[in-house]
């Protein structure tokens, strides 16, 4: 089963034992935006994708669904 962008972000966040507010503070994003991205109500911007990739140390290809391996 292929995970959505938001599901991957949620899994990565939970792997680091962070709540949405903690992640928001670390990547300079609002908690509401993270919530909307995780549940699929909002598409991330390029800058958002870059922020998630840098913080979680994963490739953009993984997050956007081009590869199934985090790398």
Predicted regions and their residues:
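Residues in the helix-turn-helix
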Residues: 33, 43, 62
């Amino acid at each position: 089963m292929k995970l959505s962008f938001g599901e991957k972000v949620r899994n990565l966040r939970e792997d680091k034992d962070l709540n949405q507010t903690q992640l928001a503070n670390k990547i300079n994003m609002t908690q509401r935006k993270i919530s909307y991205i995780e549940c699929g109500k909002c598409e991330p911007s390029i800058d958002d994708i870059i922020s998630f990739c840098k913080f979680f140390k994963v490739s953009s290809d993984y997050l956007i669904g081009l590869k199934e391996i985090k790398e």
